[in-house]
């Protein structure tokens, strides 16, 4: 039982290493230009993408667009919430100022100064 478990983990570990080495090789080929390159058919005008790449590109563009819309929504929400709170605080301050009564001591000082 232990021998088969050990062999299974060694096998799985070897497969993981092979996949990571393949991934590393692909990344190195991509960065150095040794791998398969995307070429244009009409002299550099437009790139012809495979169907999977096209779907991935469209998915990424849609994700970016949705993220931009959500970011703008949050920014405008914070802005308008802040403006609304500022307006309410100004009206509350005006309400409190109108309800304030001056004390008799202040009136006496004002009469004494004039």
Swiss-Prot record:
It comes from the Eukaryota. Signal peptide: none annotated. It is a single-pass membrane protein. Its main location: membrane. The chain crosses the membrane at residues 61-81. Coiled coil: none annotated. It is found in: Membrane. GO terms for cellular component: membrane. The keyword Hydrolase does not apply. Keywords: Membrane, Transmembrane, Transmembrane helix. Belongs to the reprimo family. This is Reprimo-like protein. It comes from Danio rerio. The lineage of its organism: Eukaryota, Metazoa, Chordata, Craniata, Vertebrata.
């Amino acid at each position: 039982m232990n021998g088969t478990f050990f062999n299974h983990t060694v096998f799985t570990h070897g497969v993981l290493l092979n996949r990571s080495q393949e991934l590393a090789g692909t990344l190195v080929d991509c960065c150095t230009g040794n791998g398969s390159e995307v070429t244009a058919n009409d002299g550099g005008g437009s790139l012809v993408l495979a169907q999977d790449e096209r779907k991935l590109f469209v998915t990424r563009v849609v994700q970016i667009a949705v993220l931009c819309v959500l970011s703008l929504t949050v920014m405008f929400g914070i802005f308008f919430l802040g403006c609304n709170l500022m307006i309410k605080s100004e009206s509350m301050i005006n309400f409190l100022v109108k309800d304030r009564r001056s004390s008799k001591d202040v009136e006496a000082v004002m009469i004494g100064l004039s």
